């Protein structure tokens, strides 16, 4: 006989947080949102990869490209580049993010002394960069022989056939810094010598990076930027359970910091095969998340398979219609509460803490805090990020309102046979996502700052200043339908201010 759950499943909107004692320490500026991204032995070692804010962007064509990945990494979060594209194009997106190093920039424009002014101008037109490194082999890490900037030539007075060696600033006239130089030290040198660009060289005088004066303000503006040991932005990449034998090596070679299996339902042998492939070929050096699941059994399965984190949620996304078309899924809040308990149980048994990601169901900013209180270590957001300038879709004017396009990976538009098909066919028999618009909201930086300030303020109301303390000490209450109505404005007539109802 089929098993029937005794209680209905619930969404975030059916819960409220009950305030706790707020001490003098509980102010937003003292709240830390740092949170683990991958599994580790909690209490015995530091987490190998942590997020500075509990936000990752969804593995979607309409959300996560390299532009959004850089913007989110600057704020302390992580993007998973969408996998519903060719292996080559996904790997190239990853490479572009990894080359956008925070402060230390790998030279994208490189020539030899034997090239010409015409080559310099062509590179500037192609890449948009005015600084060209001159190395022995025209490689970004070749022996440094000089640099060319717009100050070194005048197109109106020089022949485009002129050799670079005749107008470049030679090595002996350059001020450089060793590869051990910190970003602060590099900026100090730039300001002391009034430089626009500082080459960073190794012990063999080979170029490693540039540090640019123009980036100084940006460094100060993004203190939580998520970086690796080489000061490059962190980036994730989505994979599927079909072409992973070819896709994973390409993404690892491109520099992806973490992978995530993109599937509407993760409690399957297909996910085990993908994780087994990673462990057999890379051991624990390659990190991989899996999902999605909605109960204890699904979590235990993926944790025991070796997943580095587990995604929770089926059918809760704003463009996902899996529940409607297949009749499978569960209320996001109920799913998260059960999986969080399973995560803690697994930790007590093994000493290994496997972070969980709440994927879907976030409609309002306060839902973020609820999800964290219910046990999520971080949140995967699609619609939220699709609204911003940095998302890859078009901004349109529809009925007098600016919107951005937003479509699900289960829609025909995404052509995502790799997520849903199980029998080898590449057609999509039916859709599990819709094609839609979301209201345009402006820049990622401004909106993320506003949302996270609300999260921090709510945490202070709960008497906590860290996510682990919120998970441990939060008090939540299920509310009735009339309580939900009571929580909004009622029994009044709103005044029209010309600025909306804000």
Where are these regions (language model features)?
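Active-site-adjacent beta->alpha loops and helix N-cap segments on the catalytic face
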Residues: 85-96, 141, 156-161, 206-226, ...
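Short beta-strand/loop segments at the ligand-binding rim of alpha/beta enzyme cores
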Residues: 48-57, 103-108, 228-237, 278-294, ...
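Bateman/CBS regulatory modules and CBS-like beta-alpha motifs in cytosolic regions of diverse proteins
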Residues: 27-51, 58-60, 89-129, 134-138, ...
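Surface-exposed amphipathic alpha-helices with a cationic face
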Residues: 44-48, 73, 98, 121-125, ...
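Glycine-rich phosphate-binding active-site loops on the catalytic face of alpha/beta enzymes
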Residues: 74-89, 256-268, 308-326, 362-396
């Amino acid at each position: 006989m089929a098993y029937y759950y005794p209680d209905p499943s619930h969404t975030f909107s059916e819960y409220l947080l009950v305030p706790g004692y707020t001490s003098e320490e509980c102010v937003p500026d003292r709240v830390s949102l740092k949170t683990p991204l991958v599994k580790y032995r909690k209490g015995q070692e530091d987490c190998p990869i942590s997020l500075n804010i509990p936000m990752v962007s969804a593995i979607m064509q309409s959300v996560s490209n390299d532009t959004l990945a850089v913007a989110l990494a600057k704020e302390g979060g992580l993007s998973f580049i969408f996998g519903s594209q060719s292996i080559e194009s996904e790997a190239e997106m990853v490479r572009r993010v990894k080359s956008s190093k925070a402060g230390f920039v790998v030279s994208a424009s490189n020539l030899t002394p034997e090239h010409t002014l015409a080559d310099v101008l062509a590179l500037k037109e192609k890449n948009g960069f005015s600084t060209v490194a001159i190395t022995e082999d025209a490689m970004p890490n070749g022996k440094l022989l000089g640099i060319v900037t717009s100050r070194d030539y005048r197109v109106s007075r020089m022949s485009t056939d002129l050799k670079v060696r005749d107008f470049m600033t030679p090595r002996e006239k350059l001020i450089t810094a060793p590869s051990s130089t910190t970003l602060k030290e590099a900026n100090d040198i730039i300001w002391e010598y009034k430089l626009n660009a500082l080459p960073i060289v190794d012990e063999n005088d080979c170029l490693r990076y540039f540090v640019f004066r123009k980036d100084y303000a940006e460094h100060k503006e993004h203190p939580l930027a998520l970086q690796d040991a080489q000061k490059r932005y962190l980036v994730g990449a989505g994979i599927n359970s079909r072409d992973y034998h070819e896709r994973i090596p390409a993404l690892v070679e491109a520099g992806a910091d973490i992978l995530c299996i993109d599937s509407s339902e993760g409690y399957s042998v297909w996910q085990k095969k993908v994780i087994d492939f990673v462990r057999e070929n890379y051991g624990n050096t390659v990190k991989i998340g899996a999902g999605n699941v909605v109960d204890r059994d699904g979590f235990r399965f993926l944790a025991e398979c070796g997943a580095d984190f587990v995604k929770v949620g089926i059918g809760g996304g704003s463009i996902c219609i899996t529940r409607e078309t297949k009749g499978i899924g569960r209320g996001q809040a109920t799913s998260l509460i059960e999986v969080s308990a399973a995560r803690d149980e697994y930790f007590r048994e093994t000493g290994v803490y496997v972070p969980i990601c709440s994927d879907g169901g976030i409609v309002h900013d306060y839902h973020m805090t609820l999800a964290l209180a219910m046990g999520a270590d971080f949140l995967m957001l699609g619609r939220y990020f699709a609204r911003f300038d940095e998302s890859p879709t078009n901004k349109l004017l529809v009925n007098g309102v600016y919107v951005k396009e937003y479509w699900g990976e289960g829609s025909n538009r995404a052509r995502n046979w790799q997520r849903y098909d199980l029998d080898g066919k590449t057609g999509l028999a039916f859709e599990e996502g819709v094609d839609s618009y979301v209201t345009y909201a402006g820049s990622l930086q401004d909106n993320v700052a506003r949302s996270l300030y609300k999260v921090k303020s709510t945490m202070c109301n709960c008497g906590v200043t860290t996510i682990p303390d919120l998970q441990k000490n939060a008090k939540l209450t299920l509310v009735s339908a009339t309580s939900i109505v009571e929580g909004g404005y009622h029994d009044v007539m709103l005044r029209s201010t010309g600025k909306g109802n804000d």
